[in-house]
Regions:
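Amphipathic alpha-helical polymerization modules
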Residues: 1-140
């Protein structure tokens, strides 16, 4: 595996973690939203990753070098919490308001995990860059 593959692999991870952070941001932004006129509340989105062999992306001879890609973004189908508040403008006929199914604590943990993974891959790129520069300096 060449050093340039390190950058490509880390870049796939950065892209994937960025999408994960976007989903977390969307989930947290909608954590306290209620069902709309259609009766449907916001559903938390989850990002699923899949291994991506770099040989499949056009790199010859590096079939065992694996990056990552987003395979799917799904909506959590668990029902949102229902609160009895008959005076709320979004209350149904029984006086219940349906909120999103976002668990803010889980989302914060997910955000910390995605952020750390993103930072780790930046560190991988910085280390690879430093090694390449040192290799070039040895040739002088």
């Amino acid at each position: 595996m060449s050093m340039t593959n390190v950058f490509q692999i880390a870049a796939t991870a950065l892209t994937a973690q960025s999408m994960r952070l976007n989903a977390v941001a969307s989930n947290l932004a909608n954590a306290d939203t209620v069902a709309g006129p259609d009766g449907q509340a916001y559903k938390a989105r989850q990002v699923t990753f899949q291994s991506q062999l770099m040989g499949q992306t056009g790199q010859i001879g590096d079939a065992d070098a694996a990056g990552v890609k987003v395979s799917n973004i799904t909506e959590d189908q668990t029902p949102g919490r229902r609160v009895h508040d008959p005076k709320h403008p979004s209350a149904d006929a029984d006086g219940y308001v349906t909120y999103s199914n976002v668990n803010a604590v889980e989302e914060m943990v997910n955000m910390i995990s995605a952020s750390r993974s993103y930072q780790n891959n930046i560190e991988v790129m910085n280390t690879a860059k430093s090694l390449l520069l040192k290799t070039l300096q040895m040739g002088q």
